[in-house]
């Protein structure tokens, strides 16, 4: 059974549900808003799967192996993979927001302090760093373990390192 995109979308939406900008679409019906959000989620999922694919150690997994028509991956994702992709989507979403802030800063120049004080920008930057750090932690955890959960991924680890790791287990 293939994992539906909706599983990943729901994890992503749970992360951003407090962000009114993502869900605020004036003069749109509820159905139109749902379509817009779904398109937005798909766009982020598409980019995230490509990027995550390049960052994982397990080359047998291909997150771009998907069926967009059925809105599903062509294989079953494990929970940490769903979370990894959703977290990357979350990071990409905030990177886009960062670009908007920088564009506004460039456009407004010194006047930006009237609209976005330095403290708020610093808070945003700190939040982005935390999101990236959380993603990196999930990625490291994913890369360190075998997909079936039976042990650790020791691909590319020397025999000396294996004996050190084995002594911890």
What residue spans do the PLM features occupy?
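Long amphipathic alpha-helical coiled-coil segments
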Residues: 101-115, 142-157
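Elongated alpha-helical scaffolds
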Residues: 78-99
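Short linear sequence motifs
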Residues: 2-5, 35, 52, 84-87, ...
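A short, terminal or domain-edge coil/loop segment
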Residues: 83-88, 114-126, 155-169
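Conserved short "hinge" loops at termini or chain/domain junctions
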Residues: 1-79, 141-144, 150-169
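Short, solvent-exposed secondary-structure capping/transition elements
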Residues: 57, 61, 94-106
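Polybasic, proline/glycine-rich intrinsically disordered low-complexity segments
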Residues: 117-153
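Short, exposed interaction segments that mediate macromolecular assembly or regulatory contacts
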Residues: 69-79, 107-121
């Amino acid at each position: 059974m293939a994992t539906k995109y909706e599983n990943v979308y729901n994890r992503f939406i749970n992360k951003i549900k407090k962000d009114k900008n993502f869900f605020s679409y004036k003069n749109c019906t509820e159905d139109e808003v749902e379509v817009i959000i779904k398109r937005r989620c798909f766009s982020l999922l598409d980019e995230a799967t490509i990027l995550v694919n390049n960052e994982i150690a397990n080359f047998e997994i291909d997150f771009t192996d998907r069926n967009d028509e059925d809105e599903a991956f062509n294989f079953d994702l494990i929970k940490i993979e769903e979370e990894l992709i959703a977290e990357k989507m979350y990071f990409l979403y905030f990177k886009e927001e960062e670009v908007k802030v920088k564009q506004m800063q460039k456009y407004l120049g010194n006047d930006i302090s009237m609209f976005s004080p330095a403290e708020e920008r610093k808070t945003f930057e700190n939040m982005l760093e935390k999101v990236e750090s959380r993603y990196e932690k999930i990625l490291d955890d994913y890369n360190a373990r075998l997909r079936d959960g039976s042990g650790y991924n020791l691909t590319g680890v020397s025999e000396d390192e294996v004996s050190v790791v084995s002594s911890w287990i």
